[in-house]
Every structure is written in structure tokens, then in C-alpha cells.
Amino acid sequence: MDWSELQVMVVEDHGFQRRIALRLLTELGVERALEGADGLDALDVLRRQAAPPDVVLVDLDMPGMDGIECIGQIAQERLARAVVVVSALDPALLHTVQTMARAYGLRVLGSVEKPLTRDKLEEVLVRFGDHVGEQHDESEADFTVPALLEALGNGEIVPWFQPQVEFGNGKVVGVEALARWERPDGSVVRPVLFVPLLEREGRADALTERMLDEGCRWLQRWCRDGMRLKLSVNVSPLALADPAAADRYQAIVESHAISPEDVVLEITESSVMTDAARGLGVLARLRLKGFGLSIDDFGTGYSSLAQLAQVPFTELKVDREFVFSAHSQPRKRAVVEASLDLARKLNLTTVAEGVETVEDWQLLAELGCSIAQGWLIGRPVPGSELPAAIARWRRPVL
């Protein structure tokens, strides 16, 4: 990306370190930089901006308002498009703060351990640039709930597909269906901006069924063209409270002459615990019908091990947060390694999300992960563009 177009803020109480960060940004080509001497100063500067900056680098250990409270305010007031957590503190604490920020709905590019270097900054900032092309010109607040529900009803919300490839041979073996709102004006809205609203309105299950229906339609078309793939679809927590969901999903899949065995339903950790007894019953029926079941974002909830013991999962997805920088952060590597080892002992297929660099690929391949998904392989694309995206894919030469 053109770094000169990026606006970045540095929030750091130590003047010398703040100047180093600003100098490193200049070396990267960032021409628009803001600075704050502490949390309160940063919030004052941010509130006076005509538009939120692209990225805010926030030090955690500051006097007065610390970085944790500052990030919370930035998220609640939507004062930035993304943040990067900067600190010399325990990596486990950095991960906790990132999880908090995401819970607020704030995009987190990652964490950077001090001392800052140009390479460290570039590694996280490029993650913002990578996703700019997917965001297009969407406006985060430029739609109403009625407009969203109308869009769901008239087919504007469609699946885009991200390839999944085997580490062993580099072969594309599946895709994940990811919702996108293709608006009449040509803009594309990411799911993080509208899925929470659908969940609040009790319509998220309708989105799941649409992704499943359209995904199977494409799966059938690709199969006719000689591309045999599996389809992964995220399941709304609402579905797990509905005893009839398993029958509906089976009917949708089979209406396209697709076997349930070619479909993997991704379940987040928290969704099962909403109504454990009913949820376990629905999952058991789905598995009985042949659907694969994936525990999504493994390790980010509070009941991972209990879930694995109770639910007949066939797949474990390692969360992108653990994958990012696992090659350079021993704690993250340990989490990934332990997750993969546990999955092997339970005879589960393993999928690593957020594989974005050759270093990510190399580490996960060494640790024995089954399948990779991420921007290194390909970004989510409309169904019509998937064959070309697969044709462009080349397995990294290690």
C-alpha cells in the first residue's frame, strides 16, 4: 500500500521512545502522524480529528490514564479504525488486552514488544494495508437496521469464499463462506459491521441458512467444473437453540445434491454454552446426519476443554490471534503447539486461521497442522472469482 496515505497516532509517555516511533514511521513512508503523551492527551487529540486515524499505537504502561483504559475509550467512542498494542510487559498481558479490545468491537492489528524496530512496525501495519482492499468505501454507520434486514431478504448479503489448503501438498481442499453485504452503490460491507446487528435482531440464523444455501449452490457449480471442495459455514448461536435446525440444514444441502459430509459447520465456543443441553442435542443430530463440526476460534473462550470433551467435533480451528507472530513469540507458539498436539490425540483435523506470512506457514507445517487458511493463500473473493484465485496459488518454497 501507499504508506503516505496512512494516518498513524503514537501514544507513548516516554518522550524519547515516542520520537523513535515517529521517526520509524517516517522511514516507512508514513507522512501523517499524530502523537499523545498519555491516554488523556491522546483522547483529546483524537476527539478533535475530523476523521478517525487509521491506526493508533498505544503503550500500556503510562501514568495517569494507562493504555488499557485508553484503548477502551477509543473503542467505545470509535476514535480509530484500528489499534496496535505496544509494551515491554508480559506477552500474556498483551494478549489479554487485545482480546479486550476485540470484545469492544475494535480492530486489533496485533501487538509489538518493545523496543520498537522498523521491521516490527512494518509487520503489524501491513496487516492494515492488506485489508484495505476488502473494505472498499464502506461507511460504518451508513445503514439502518431496516435497510440491513431488507438487504438480507433481497439477496444483497452473499458469501465470499476463502481457500483452505493442505500443508502437506499445498492442494486447495476447501473454502470458508464469509458473509459480505454487496450494496447497490458498489460498496462492500464486512460482516463485523452487520452480523452483530442481525444477532441482536434475532435474524442471524437466517444469515447462516443463506450462506449454506448459496455456498452449496457454488459448491455444486465448482464440482461440475472439476473442482471438488469442502464448504465451511459459520453457524449462528440461535441455531443451536432450535431442534429443527439439523433437519433444515440437511434439506438445504441435499437440495443442491451436496452430501452433508462435504459441509463443515463452524461453532464458536460460547454458542454451545448458551443453552448447553439443547445445543448439545442439535450438534449431535447434525453430526448424525454427516455434517462436520468445527470448534471455531479455539482457545479464545473459557470452556475449550469442556467443549472438546462433550461435543463430537471433527475439526479444530486455531484462532488467528495465536497464529500471528507465533514464530517469534514463545508463548503463542506454545499455545499453538499444545492445541495441535491435543487435536491430534483427539483425531481432529486442524485448521490454522490467519496464515499471512511464509514464516507462519513454515512454523505451522513444522508443528504438523493439517490445513492453512489466510491471506498468504488468498483473500475472500466472490464465487465467480474463486477458480482464478486458486489458479494463482503457489505453495511456499521452504
PLM regions and their residue ranges:
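Active-site residues of response regulator receiver
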Residues: L57-D59, D319
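Two-component/phosphorelay signaling modules centered on CheY-like receiver
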Residues: L6-Q7, G15-L34
